[in-house]
Amino acid sequence: MKNSNKRSKADSSLSQEAVKKPKLLVDPSKDYLKFDTGKSTFESFIGNEIGLEKFLADYWEKKPLFIQRNENEKWVEYVKTLFSLDQLKEIIKINNLKYGQDLNLCKLVNDKKKNFNKNGSVKLDHVTKCFEKDSATIQFHQPQRFSDQLWRLIEKFECYFNNLVGSNIYITPDDSQGLPVLIKTFFLYIN
């Protein structure tokens, strides 16, 4: 019995070490969102223009809502701190990410999705080449595993909605399209 307990502890510490995170880019005490509760987080996320009651009554599971924020607002600066291409590059450098499982590279060519993934571990030089030279979109799955800021935001949403919240980051070069036009049946946030 003692050996299995020791192995269990060792396995759990290994899994905690497996995910390495880059440095935090923003002081959490200067958050734009209110993180007191899941409700206050979601209310501050959708903004005062709509409000939570109107959102739930008129939009939730009924129709899409597009919220456009003024470029001069603190919101834009805050969102820029949540995730960036530089953060992704650092994550790729310090973690053993896998194509398909953690990250995809793709581009729309003649109305068809072209995949740039390789087999095995993600290599930063390949991602950089595909993004910069081939204008491929980077799709990064579950970024909250590597970003405490995103994890905190998603955790509050999960608490408020009492449901799991999925997250992907799509980074697409200017004048490019990574995926064909499609209709999503879930909440989508675009920055």
Regions found by a protein language model. Give the residues of each.
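Positively charged, lysine/arginine-rich intrinsically disordered segments
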Residues: 6-8, 13, 20
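Structured beta-strand/turn binding interfaces of compact recognition modules in eukaryotic regulators
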Residues: 70
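Active-site region of the double-stranded beta-helix
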Residues: 18-50, 56-58, 73, 80-81, ...
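Short hydrophobic/aromatic beta-strand or adjacent loop that forms the aromatic wall/cage
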Residues: 64
